A protein has these predicted regions:
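Long, ordered, helix-rich scaffold segments
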Residues: 356, 383, 532-885
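A surface-exposed beta-strand-loop module
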Residues: 46-118, 139, 174, 521-538
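Hydrophobic alpha-helical and helix-loop surface patches within well-folded domains
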Residues: 182, 211-460, 468-469
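Beta-strand-rich binding/interaction modules
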Residues: 64-71, 438-441, 451-542, 636-639, ...
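Short acidic/polar inter-strand loop motif in beta-rich domains
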Residues: 104-111, 476-477, 546-552
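Surface-exposed beta-strand/loop patches in extracellular or lumenal glycoproteins
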Residues: 40-63, 136-139, 145-154, 425, ...
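N-terminal, polar/Ser/Thr-rich
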Residues: 1-36, 116-125, 137, 141, ...
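Extended, low-hydrophobicity, Ser/Thr/Pro/Gly-biased non-transmembrane segments
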Residues: 101-204, 571-574, 581
């Protein structure tokens, strides 16, 4: 903790390490009230750094140094320099061995970085800079070493002892203790180190690789969760096969392990051979996990497995290059999920998330490029920009080069850089070299922050049969970047005739048309694209598949959007047309509300939804997505000044009117789908998930009628279903309804039945935290006293406080500022307990400039109170100070 201003680290100051560590030998002695770490490091002067022997400066925090030896000679206090951040030693020769022993306290480590206790087990989290809390080391990603790790602990409490690589030896020490040694043959940076010790059960399977090697697959969990891992195991085997088929990447160790941990700051961690997962990303079975949770497990298992190549075999030179591994791997996992499920639905989900959350980040005080220029605390840059926008940047390269060209580029990247720590530029260079293209201008996506705008206009010349698209790009100022150079923006499009068919696309100067769908490269501030031989006035279908992470504007009328919603051959753009239509209609309602007029819903939206409900051929998951109105958070993001109350009232009014007007078709679809759900055993497969998603959105609309038959249907679904997806939706409908007696009974029944399952209780907290009914803050404050809640568990904090501040906008933003005060209070407490979680919880307050003057003053006041609250962690200080700048 610190009160002085923390140091800013800049990309431009990067220098390679003075020394390299060839071998790392660690021995851990784990006890209940402390642990001892013995390290033996074989170091040498880095030849890239020239001659001479500068001091060796090792990172280390919260370590008690007990012994230090250089080349076998004990060092006294006068022989080294020690402060809170590092240990300095003067080497006497270019190659040397340093041995140290430190005492650490995992049992009291609430920050969950380094080595810590989660419940009864020991585990680690070293990315980004947690290893320095374990032992003195060069804790930076460009120092890669071969690790051998021995773990010693009490045998009865900790029968399972795990680390990276392959197990090579184990034995008993007597006095009730035992040990195990693990050896990882691959060089890795310290952030990929892992250790687990606990009383764990294991589900084991195997996988035969494309070169016919058998790999043992093991998932370790606490005994009560042994029946919740089959889905994760199936997902792992699918992702191993997919990575071989799509990228030619084969697994390289004899064993692959996953461990589920309840107390974890992130989703999961790709440590070499020993992935450590937040239990929420690995445990799933029908009765306890929703469809969304099953899909999250599948996606996260794949993401961490894919890191074995895109992250571990080829890693980052420095943390500014984080998107090198994360953007690429998010792209890989989203493509995997698209192949396993519905590609269009996956794209819709990803884009809705990106536009609501990452676009807001890009428009706020924490805006930064995909490759940031500077940071105070690296854990603040595990962001939507680095991950999700970074993935979109990789996707654009894929779009521009095509699948075959992209694969050539990724093959060259892995071949050229295996075993190295490299940069985003190295990734792009491999793509360029493999395809003979120049991506110099494209690289602005890595260095410029903010969301580009694309303004498009169309003009048809009937006599000449020419259609001209004028495209203008711009990008608003962001912190530290007042003006931007033009990006390379892949604009995928089609032109539709009056029947909704694609017209052949031939640009001026081309001899022949190139099909009905193509990608234009927008590279200038203003460009014209002239299509020839266009027989009639076309309607453009623009930015198909969301081919670039930009804000697009085109002057569509509502009738044109209705036409695209029904006829566009691009599934994503059908959804997008519906979203834009809904936005126009909702913004009209918001204006009426602000002027105190009676609210009138455009009947065209209802008719569009009626047509959707009648379309039995359309994928039910797409029907469900298209029936979902834009969220309050998205409506906030696209507002100049967000009127929280008008947005909430208008959206609720629209939902109410849709539910009333379409009661019959919604009721028909609901009953038909619920009957199949009743008669069919649960499967987490695309068609079943689609059926339940339409069934559940229908129920949520129907519930707004307040009719007794809907209450009965809701209770039947709640009590009579065999899966959490249906049960949780029914519970949420009751919680948001006026049926007080039934609501109270259902909540009590749920909590009583699932009280011993922490992940299910997280869902119970979230359903209540997200309810927009009056009194939301008081409900959340009461729930914080519930025995299942603790501030020390990040999942609980996210489920209750995070859900309230991020999803329950009408209650969080109540005019008296009590919601802001509550959030600031929690951030101040968490700053001392777990700085990473505290800084993430802060995000809603950082968006204070979005709101009316009264709310701005209240939100700003809470940020200032946090800043003045005493010893702030660098995590919280950076976010608060940038938000107030």
């Amino acid at each position: 903790m610190r009160t002085e201003q923390p140091k800013v680290i800049h990309l431009k100051d990067y220098q390679a390490a003075d020394y390299l560590i060839d071998e790392t030998h660690l021995k851990f002695e784990l006890f209940e009230d402390h642990s001892l770490v013995h390290a033996e490091l074989k170091l040498r002067r880095n030849p890239e750094r020239g001659a001479g022997l500068p001091p060796l400066l090792l990172h280390g925090q919260q370590l008690e140094l007990l012994a230090l030896e250089l080349d076998g000679q004990a060092l006294g206090a006068d022989d080294y320099q020690l402060d809170d951040e590092q240990l300095g030693v003067q080497p006497r020769q270019a190659e040397f061995v340093l041995r140290s022993t430190v005492r650490i306290h995992p049992e009291s480590n609430t920050a969950l970085e380094g080595l810590y206790k989660s419940g009864k087990m020991f585990c680690t989290q070293c990315e980004a800079e947690g290893f320095r809390k374990i032992t003195y080391y060069l804790d930076r990603p460009d120092v890669m070493s071969r690790f051998t790790t021995t773990v010693s602990a009490e045998q009865q409490r900790y029968p399972v002892l795990l680390s990276n690589g392959n197990p090579v030896a184990s034995g008993s020490e007597g006095n009730g203790r035992h040990w195990a040694t693990w050896e990882d043959p691959f060089k890795k940076p310290a952030y990929l180190f892992a250790l687990v010790a606990g009383d764990l059960w294991c589900v084991e399977d195997s996988f035969r690789t494309m070169s016919q090697r058998d790999v043992a697959l093991r998932i370790y969990v606490e005994p009560e969760n042994i029946d919740k891992v089959q889905h994760a195991m199936d997902s792992l085997k699918k992702s191993m096969r997919w990575d071989e088929e799509v990228y030619g990447r084969e697994y390289d160790l004899d064993i692959f392990m996953i461990v589920a941990v309840n107390d974890f700051n992130m989703g999961a961690m790709e440590n070499k051979g020993l992935n450590i997962f937040n239990s929420s990303c690995v445990l799933a079975r029908a009765e306890t996990a929703t469809d969304a949770a099953h899909q999250r497990v599948e996606g996260v298992v794949a993401h961490e497995y894919f890191h074995n190549w895109s992250g571990n075999r080829v890693t980052c030179r420095d943390w500014f290059q984080l998107s090198l591994k994360e953007g690429f791997t998010v792209f890989r996992d989203s493509e995997f999920s698209a192949d396993m499920n519905s590609r269009t639905v996956k794209r819709v989900e990803d884009v809705a998330f990106l536009r609501t959350n990452q676009f807001a980040e890009d428009a706020g005080p924490m805006a930064h490029p995909v490759r940031p220029d500077s940071f105070i605390e690296i854990s603040n840059f595990y962001t939507l920009t680095v991950y999700e926008k970074g993935s979109e940047v990789v996707r654009m390269i894929h779009t521009l080069l095509g699948a075959e060209g992209f694969r050539k580029g990724s093959d060259l990247y892995f071949q050229r850089h295996d075993g190295q720590a490299v940069t985003c530029d190295d990734f792009v260079k491999a793509m360029e070299d493999a395809n003979g293209v120049d991506l110099t201008q494209f690289k602005r996506w890595y260095s410029q922050s903010g969301t580009p705008r694309l303004a498009v206009e169309g003009e048809y010349d009937a006599a000449a049969r020419r259609y001209t698209l004028t495209v203008r790009q711009s990008c608003p100022p962001t912190p530290g970047q007042p003006s931007k150079e033009p990006f390379v923006i892949p604009l995928e499009l089609g032109l539709l005739d009056g029947q909704g068919h694609e017209l052949p696309l031939r640009l001026e100067g081309e001899a022949v048309a190139q099909g009905g769908n193509r990608v234009l490269a927008v590279t200038e501030a203003e460009q014209r694209f002239v299509f020839v031989e266009v027989p009639e006035q076309p309607l453009p279908s623009l930015l198909r598949g969301f081919s670039a992470p930009v804000k697009l504007s085109f002057p569509y009328s509502r009738d044109q959007l209705l036409f695209l919603m029904q006829h566009d051959s691009d599934g994503f753009n059908r959804w997008e047309a519906g979203q834009q239509l809904s936005v126009q209609v909702l913004q009209e309602l918001i204006g009426q509300h602000q002027r105190g007029e009676q609210l009138v819903l455009d009947p065209r939206l209802i008719e569009a939804y009626r047509t959707l409900l009648a379309d039995e051929a359309l994928d039910q998951a797409m029907v469900a997505e298209m029936l979902s109105l834009p969220s309050e958070a998205y409506l906030t993001e696209i507002s100049e000044v967000a009127d929280v109350d008008a947005i909430h009232a208008s959206r609720e009014f629209a939902r109410q009117r849709i539910g009333e007007a379409l009661f019959e078709p919604l009721w028909q679809r609901y009953q038909a789908n619920r009957k199949i759900s009743r008669d069919t055993a649960y499967l987490a497969e695309a068609s079943h998930i689609a059926r339940r998603s339409l069934q559940n959105i229908a129920l949520s609309y129907l519930s707004l009628s307040g009719r007794e038959e809907i209450l009965a249907a809701c209770l039947e679904q709640y009590e009579g279903c065999d899966n959490m997806t249906e049960r949780l939706t029914a519970l949420a409908v009751l919680v948001n309804s006026g049926f007080e007696a039934e609501k109270g009974k259902a909540l009590a029944m749920f909590a009583d039945y699932f009280k011993d399952d922490p992940l299910v209780m997280d869902q119970w907290f979230s359903v209540q935290a997200g309810s927009p009914l009056p009194g939301g803050l008081e409900r959340v404050q009461a729930l914080m006293q519930h025995p299942a809640f603790t501030l020390k568990n990040p999942n609980k904090v996210r489920a209750l406080i995070g859900a309230f501040a991020n999803q329950n906008l009408v209650n969080f933003h109540r005019p008296d500022g009590a919601g802001y005060r509550f959030l600031a209070d929690q951030v101040i407490v968490l700053n001392a307990l777990n700085p990473q979680i505290a800084s993430r919880l802060l995000v809603p307050l950082t968006r204070w400039r979005k709101y009316d003057e009264a709310r701005q003053a209240l939100m700003r006041g809470e940020l200032e109170r946090i800043l003045a609250s005493g010893e702030l962690s660098s995590d919280v200080y950076e976010v608060v100070s940038k938000s107030l700048a």
